[in-house]
C-alpha cells in the first residue's frame, strides 16, 4: 500500500489538474454558447438562400454555368475543417476516419486547423507528391469575408479545370453531446441538393413566393452560384466551431468529474493508510510497555 506521503502528493496533483480542467470547461462553455448561436442563426438564411436559387433555375432558361455542369471527375479537392487545439474528445479522430473512408489517389486537400493539417500534410499521391495544396487559418470570430477567400480559391481551381469537383469535410453540430462528421460534395452544384432543407437542425424558413427578377434570372444566377459555395463553406466553419467548443466543454466536464471521483477514492485510501499507521504505532507502544513489565 502507498504511504500517506505518496497519497497526499497524488491528491495535490489531482486537485491541481481538476482546477485546470474546470477552468477550461468554463472557458469552453462560454465559447460554446457564442459558437452555437452563430451556427444555428445562420441555418435559416442558408435554407432560404437555397430556395431562392432553386426558384431562379427554372427562369434561367438554358443557362449553362460551370458550377452546375457535371463532368467526369479526374481530380477532386476536399476542404477539411478541423481544430487547432486538442482536448476535444474524438472530434478530429472521427472526422479523419470519415476522410479516410472517402480518400482516393485523385484527391487534393485544403485544410483549416492544425490537427487535420498535420495529418493531411503526410498524405502522398501515386507519384509521391504532396496532396495538401493550402492551409487556412482557423479563427473563432471568422467572418464571411474570410470564408469567401477560401471559396474564391476553390472556385478558381474548379473554373480553370484544375479540379472537377469540390467537397467539404467538417463536424456538423447537432447538439452539445452530438457532433456528426460530414463529407459532402458542394460543386458541381446538384439541383436536387438545392431544395433540401435542414428541418432537423434549423427552424423552417419562410416559403419563397414567385418573383419577377430584375436583373434577369440568368444574371442573378451568375452571381449567386459562387455566393452559394461561399455560404456553404462559411456555414460549415460555423458548425465546426460549435462542434469543437461543445466537444471540449463536455470532455473537460468529464475530466473534472473523473478527477473528483478519483479524489474521493484517494481520500478514503489516505484515511485508511493513516488509520493503519496510527494503529501500528499504538501496538508498538503497547508492546514496548508490556516488554518493560
From Swiss-Prot:
It is a peripheral membrane protein. It is found in: Cell membrane. It comes from the Bacteria. One of its GO terms (biological process) is proton motive force-driven plasma membrane ATP synthesis. One of its GO terms (molecular function) is proton-transporting ATP synthase activity, rotational mechanism. GO terms for cellular component: plasma membrane; proton-transporting ATP synthase complex. The keyword Cell cycle does not apply. HAMAP family: ATP_synth_gamma_bact (MF_00815). This is ATP synthase gamma chain. The gene is atpG.
Amino acid at each position: 500500500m502507498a504511504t500517506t506521503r505518496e497519497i497526499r502528493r497524488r491528491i495535490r496533483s489531482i486537485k491541481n489538474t481538476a482546477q485546470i480542467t474546470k477552468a477550461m470547461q468554463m472557458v469552453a462553455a462560454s465559447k460554446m454558447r457564442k459558437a452555437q448561436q452563430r451556427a444555428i442563426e445562420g441555418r435559416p438564411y442558408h435554407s432560404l438562400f437555397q430556395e431562392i436559387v432553386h426558384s431562379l433555375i427554372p427562369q434561367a432558361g438554358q443557362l449553362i454555368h460551370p458550377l452546375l455542369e457535371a463532368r467526369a471527375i479526374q481530380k477532386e479537392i476536399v476542404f477539411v475543417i478541423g481544430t487547432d487545439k486538442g482536448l476535444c474528445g474524438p472530434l478530429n479522430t472521427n472526422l479523419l476516419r470519415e476522410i479516410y473512408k472517402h480518400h482516393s489517389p485523385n484527391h487534393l486537400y485544403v485544410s483549416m486547423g492544425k490537427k487535420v493539417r498535420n495529418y493531411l500534410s503526410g498524405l502522398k499521391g501515386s507519384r509521391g507528391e504532396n496532396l495538401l495544396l493550402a492551409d487556412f487559418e482557423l479563427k473563432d470570430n471568422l467572418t464571411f469575408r474570410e470564408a469567401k477567400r477560401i471559396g474564391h480559391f476553390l472556385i478558381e481551381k474548379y473554373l480553370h479545370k484544375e479540379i472537377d469537383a469540390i467537397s467539404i469535410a467538417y463536424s456538423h453540430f447537432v447538439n452539445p453531446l452530438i457532433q456528426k462528421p460530414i463529407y459532402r460534395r458542394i460543386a458541381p452544384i446538384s439541383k436536387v441538393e438545392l431544395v433540401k432543407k435542414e428541418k432537423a437542425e434549423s427552424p423552417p424558413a419562410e416559403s419563397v413566393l414567385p418573383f419577377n427578377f430584375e436583373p434577369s434570372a440568368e444574371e442573378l444566377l451568375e452571381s449567386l452560384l459562387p455566393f452559394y459555395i461561399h455560404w456553404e463553406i462559411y456555414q460549415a466553419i460555423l458548425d465546426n466551431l460549435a462542434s469543437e467548443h461543445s466537444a471540449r466543454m463536455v470532455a473537460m466536464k468529464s475530466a473534472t468529474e473523473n478527477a473528483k471521483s478519483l479524489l474521493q477514492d484517494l481520500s478514503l485510501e489516505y484515511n485508511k493508510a493513516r488509520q493503519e499507521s496510527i494503529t501500528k504505532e499504538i501496538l508498538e507502544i503497547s508492546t514496548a510497555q508490556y516488554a518493560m513489565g
